[in-house]
A protein has these predicted regions:
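Intrinsically disordered, low-complexity activation-like regions
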Residues: 2-4, 29-130, 134-243
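N-terminal intrinsically disordered, low-complexity tails
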Residues: 8-32
Length: 243
């Protein structure tokens, strides 16, 4: 996701090879009856603000379609055409969300997720390699924290929906948020069986290690006008240091 080489690039390998993905039976173990979940999802989608619905349909696919809630390679790679599409379709939505004009979306779990996608993902797509890519991170984290505290994340329709609800924790330059990211992605991994290299939980741990070491993400330093330390510069020369 620029920093979209952020976690998002991380999951490209999972999308391509899907390491350790559980069987359908295992994936649903301990989960709600899928038929009931489908009915609930339809009702929740019907109640959404039309713009929030457009965001979710664009990012995760429409309910009932083959690709709904399935990993998408476009999430995780730098693609100028895809970024332009987001900028043209949702640039005004992002600006409004940053001003708090879509805070009412938080009334439902799906609405909160739509707001997170706009603030956390669309910012990165539309402002790659610039400080504005991270300008909405604090607000996205607030929304994600409320969603998790209310257990609303448990009502999201698929594992991919839940993963994007958790990414603001992973993107935060905060050790407390990183620990919560690891906790959330470990719980999700136990349910899905996705634990290998390139999985969400793998990248949650990698992000947390960097914050434990540096207290910030060194690969953001240039965009944010920060001076890198010698240790950070050495780290940035290592493979995989920028996700």
């Amino acid at each position: 996701m620029t920093e979209k080489p952020n976690h998002a690039e991380a999951m490209a390998s999972t999308t391509a090879g899907d390491t350790g993905r559980a069987s359908d039976a295992g994936r649903n173990e301990g989960q709600p009856d899928p038929r009931k979940a489908s009915i609930e999802t339809d009702a929740d989608y019907a109640a959404l603000d039309s713009t929030a619905r457009a965001v979710l349909d664009f990012w995760f696919g429409e309910p009932g379609t083959t690709g709904f809630g399935q990993p998408s390679a476009r999430w995780f790679k730098c693609d100028d055409a895809f970024d332009t599409t987001i900028r043209e379709r949702f640039g005004a939505t992002l600006a409004a969300a940053r001003r708090g004009e879509h805070d009412s979306w938080q009334g439902t779990p799906l609405g909160a997720l739509a707001l997170i996608v706009v603030l956390d993902q669309f910012s990165r797509n539309t402002c790659r390699d610039a400080a504005q890519a991270f300008a909405a991170d604090a607000k996205a984290l607030e929304v994600a924290r409320r969603l998790v505290e209310s257990h609303g994340d448990r009502h999201l329709p698929t594992a991919e929906h839940r993963a994007f609800a958790y990414l603001p924790f992973e993107h935060a330059e905060s050790l407390e948020a990183q620990r919560e990211s690891v906790r959330l992605f470990e719980a999700l991994a136990r349910e899905t069986g996705q634990t290998g290299r390139g999985s969400y939980v793998d990248y949650a741990h990698r992000h947390a290690v960097i914050i434990e070491r540096f207290g910030r993400f060194p690969h953001r330093n240039i965009a944010l006008g920060r001076v890198s330390t010698e240790e950070e510069l050495a780290f940035l020369r290592e493979p995989g240091s920028s996700f």
